[in-house]
Structures are given as structure tokens and as C-alpha cells.
Amino acid sequence: MPSKDIVMPTLRNPFDVESDERPESAVAPAPGPYDEAVREGELLRVRPQTAAGPVQIGRQHAKRRMTVWERIDVLRDPGTEPTVLYQNWGPNLDGASIVTAICQIGGREVAVYGHDFTVRAGSMDATNGTKLANVIRLAGRQGMPLVGMNDSAGAFVPAGIGGLDGYAEAFTALRKISGVVPSIMCMFGYNAGGGSYLPRQGSFMIQPSN
């Protein structure tokens, strides 16, 4: 027989709680700053998809036009999720008129942008112009085709000259990738201002006859 002084190996975990009652140390702590930051980050992540609201979405559907998120769902390969590119963190910025993403289309990565007409009629300001220019430049650097879904009222007038600056930056970026990667521009609805000029700089343009 083994001596009582010899410690025998065992698979039992000495820290296991054998009773159904959890010790006080196992009680989940109250939410702290980290939990609040995670919650706020999740709200910011979903803000672009919820910025419009049911009324504006209904108006878009009444015009027999899809929202930008529905167009992305049609474009992407089944079973894949778009990688939405965020930049405009802050009040009324992300989700304000422009969505940029990387999607799997036909088995390859494609850079995609689309105006969200349900928010500010898809109009552009300087911040969103930079966001658009960034995804265009990304397409050129990574050798990805670019698909643009244009549904915009042009520059955001309350932003003043900033709206024109935004389109100027996007125009410059699109011209620089011309001949480097193909760009397919789709026209939806009644585009005005830069919303009608920018697509003409693409490799191909698709628009309805009316």
C-alpha cells in the first residue's frame, strides 16, 4: 500500500466547485468602461445600416429603387459578407450618404462604393469625398476592380465648398486608376452634379434608358 506521505497523481481539478453554488468571486462584475466602449463600438458599426429608418427606405422602394445595402447584397457572392470600410466616426458622419466596402464578386475581391439616397439624398461633403477617394485609391493599389453605384443629389449644399472639395478628391483618385484597374459605374435614379459627372470617368458606365 502506498504511504500516506506520497502524493498520488489525480485528474481531479482542485479548483473545481463541486456544489451548484458559485463562489462570490465567480459573479460577473458590473459593466465597466471597457464594456461601455464595446457597446458603443457595436452601435457605430451598425449605424450605417440603420441610419435611414423605415420611412426613408419605404420612399426609396416606392420609387422602385433598392437601398445601397440591398444593392450590395445583390452584388456579393452568396454566403459571403462584405467588408464595410469605416472612416467617418462621429455624429452624423458614418452612414451619411456614402458606403464603401470590399465584396467577393465572382470569386474575387472587388472594391465597391454606393451612395445612400435614403440619407441626405446621397449628397457628398468633404469628409465623405475623402472616404470615397480612399476606396478608389485602395482599388488601384490592390489591383481590384471598382464598382460604383451612383444615386446622388450631388454636393451637400449646407457643407458649402466642402462638398465640391469632396468630389474633386474623388475625381482625382478615379483618374489616377484609369487604365490600371477596370471601373464599372452604375447609374440609379436622378443623379445631379458630381453624382452625374463622376461616373463618366469610369471604364464602363451602365444607366437606364429613361
PLM feature spans:
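Terminal-region recognition feature
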Residues: 2-184, 190, 195-197, 201-210
